[in-house]
């Protein structure tokens, strides 16, 4: 026989609102942006919550218990709702406490957090020798600090760095093993994903909400048809418009960083802007030695060093913050980005070619004439020409680099004023007669 009847169950009547008040008085829980949050971070699986509610109710509520549990969870969303729960970027919530960016550590879980990593902070953790040796074998020495800073950057919910990372190789180097180790470091705060899907699917961004890191361990080689979704994730510094299938769009916090492993470059089919490439940290792996024998257990060995890897990544984060979120970038990494940019936009090579055009301060050429010279250059070099509008846009975007000036005051051969550029001279004379005028 029961000696105590809770306030939420009187005279055979179950009061859902009072139950939620009672539940929240003994549980640290809030609801925001479509998710429950606790001192352990975002509640990824609501089943443990449902089970606890079930155990509290089962002695008092008999019929339709499962349905009533669902109703309680829905009411709990209202009772625990907060208007906003912004990310906190000066600390890292860990399995045994909170590590602040200044290096101080507070034990315990006193507050509700957005993300908590499943790794303990141990200032005396041994150096991750397997991990460091793996990176030394995989990457050039000057690129290791960049990886250290990027992984550290992913520890906090911030996009101040404004960069994504692409690690490129020929295949077989073992670069995707990094993703296995990071899944141990970040736990449910990391997702496997696809850069291609993010670029194509307007619902894909919402899947990355509340996530610190998205890893594409085998990036597709096709050029992206559109880049605005990817760029918006890399640069988001606040709430953005997110959309889930069949639901109204809403404002949500987005701080997922993008890391891709690939055998090729991340290219855009139409976007040739400097911004698309400037947002990429592009690292190339060393060639795999023919004599190297791969260790099938290397991922497990490195994952076992996760506490030491945390200290290593935190050192990179502190360096990044000290440098104003400017990543350490080797000359090789900068050159990689320039090569990828040029590979997707041959206008740069055209402007630096000989025999077709000349950069000359007092010269001027119409946009149409320049484009025809460019098409001739492409044809004679077995290259595909971009469209006329894209060609003009590329010249305008880089006019300072080549000391050009866009103007609409060029006089063409017919005496009409047209658009063109000052500071460039055509050395060849393509046939500008329209096909319809020719005999």
Map each language-model feature to its residues.
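Short, small/acidic-rich helices and loops at N termini and domain boundaries
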Residues: 1, 35-64
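Replication-associated primase and helicase/ATPase modules
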Residues: 1-27, 37, 42-45, 120-137, ...
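Extended, Lys/Arg-enriched charged tracts that mediate electrostatic binding to polyanionic substrates
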Residues: 8-11, 65-99
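P-loop NTPase catalytic core of nucleic-acid-dependent motor ATPases
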Residues: 24-42, 47-49, 85, 92-212, ...
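Alpha-helical scaffold elements adjacent to nucleotide-binding pockets in ATP/GTP-utilizing enzyme cores
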Residues: 52, 56, 178-181, 211, ...
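Positively charged interface segments
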Residues: 66, 70, 88, 186-188, ...
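Conserved nucleotide-sensing/catalytic segment adjacent to the nucleotide-binding pocket
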Residues: 204-250
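Phosphate-handling catalytic cores of nucleic-acid transaction enzymes
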Residues: 303-345
């Amino acid at each position: 026989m029961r000696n105590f009847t809770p306030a939420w169950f009187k005279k055979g009547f179950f009061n859902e609102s009072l139950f939620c008040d009672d539940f929240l008085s003994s549980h640290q829980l809030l609801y925001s942006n479509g998710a429950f949050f606790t001192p352990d971070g975002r509640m990824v699986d609501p089943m443990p919550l449902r089970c606890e509610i079930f155990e509290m109710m089962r002695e008092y509520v008999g019929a339709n218990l499962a349905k009533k549990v669902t109703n309680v969870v829905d009411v709990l969303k209202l009772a625990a709702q907060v208007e906003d729960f912004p990310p906190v970027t000066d600390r890292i919530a860990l399995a045994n406490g909170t590590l602040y960016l200044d290096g101080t550590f507070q034990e315990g879980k006193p507050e509700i957090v957005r993300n908590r990593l499943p790794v303990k902070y141990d200032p005396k953790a041994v150096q991750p020798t397997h991990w460091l040796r793996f990176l030394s074998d995989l990457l050039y020495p000057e690129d290791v600090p960049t990886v250290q800073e990027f992984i550290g950057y992913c520890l906090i919910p911030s996009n101040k760095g404004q960069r994504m990372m692409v690690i490129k190789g020929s295949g077989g180097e073992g670069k995707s093993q990094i993703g296995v180790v990071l899944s141990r470091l970040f736990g449910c705060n990391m997702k496997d994903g696809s850069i291609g899907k993010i670029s194509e699917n307007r619902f894909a961004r919402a899947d990355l909400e509340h996530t610190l890191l998205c890893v594409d361990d085998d990036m597709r080689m096709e050029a992206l048809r559109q880049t605005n979704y990817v760029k918006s994730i890399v640069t988001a510094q606040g709430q953005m418009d997110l959309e889930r299938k069949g639901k109204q769009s809403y404002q949500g916090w987005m701080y997922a960083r993008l890391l891709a492993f690939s055998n090729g470059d991340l290219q855009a089919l139409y976007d040739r802007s400097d911004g698309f490439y400037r947002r990429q940290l592009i690292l190339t792996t060393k060639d795999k030695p023919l004599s190297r024998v791969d260790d099938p257990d290397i991922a497990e060995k490195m994952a076992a060093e996760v506490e030491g890897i945390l200290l290593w990544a935190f050192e990179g984060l502190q360096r990044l913050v000290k440098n104003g979120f400017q990543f350490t970038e080797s000359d090789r990494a900068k050159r990689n980005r320039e090569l990828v940019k040029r590979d997707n936009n041959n206008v740069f090579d055209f402007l630096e070619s000989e025999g077709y055009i000349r950069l000359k301060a007092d010269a001027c050429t119409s946009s149409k004439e320049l484009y025809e010279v460019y098409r001739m250059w492409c044809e004679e070099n077995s290259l595909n020409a971009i469209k006329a509008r894209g060609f003009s846009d590329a010249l305008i975007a880089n006019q300072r680099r080549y000391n050009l000036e866009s103007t609409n005051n060029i006089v063409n051969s017919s005496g009409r004023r047209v658009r063109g550029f000052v500071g460039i001279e055509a050395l060849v004379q393509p046939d500008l007669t329209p096909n319809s005028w020719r005999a």
